[in-house]
């Protein structure tokens, strides 16, 4: 596994923290049938598997965010939510950079 892939993976520890932070439900629709595995900044764009970049979404909302017409509006909702959870939240801190991994 590459360093980037490892950095973008979501660890069980992060999933647990996000699940608790998100009150065990989808942050968009409130469904309890959800999982803490949605990247705000996509893995394909270098989005890290850190709690500041991960949210709990149900399958429908996750699919709409990844593939649907509501990507922009859902993205704004996720962004607002994460900003409300983390005082110094910044999108730039959510993206993999080679220099962040110990050499």
Language model: regions and residue ranges:
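Short recognition patches in nucleic-acid-associated and regulatory proteins
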Residues: 34-44
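Short cysteine-rich loop/turn motifs with clustered Cys
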Residues: 9-36, 58-60
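Short, well-ordered helical secondary-structure segments
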Residues: 25-27, 41, 76
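Polybasic, low-complexity binding patches
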Residues: 2-6, 44-55, 63-103
């Amino acid at each position: 596994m590459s360093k980037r892939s490892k950095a973008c993976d979501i660890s069980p520890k992060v999933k647990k923290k996000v699940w608790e932070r998100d009150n065990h439900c989808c942050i968009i629709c409130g469904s309890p049938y959800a999982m803490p595995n949605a990247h705000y900044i996509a893995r394909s764009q270098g989005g890290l598997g850190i709690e500041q970049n991960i949210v709990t979404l149900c399958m429908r909302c996750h699919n709409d965010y990844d593939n649907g017409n509501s990507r922009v509006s859902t993205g704004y909702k996720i962004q607002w939510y994460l900003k409300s959870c983390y005082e110094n939240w910044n999108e730039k801190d959510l993206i993999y950079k080679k220099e962040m991994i110990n050499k």
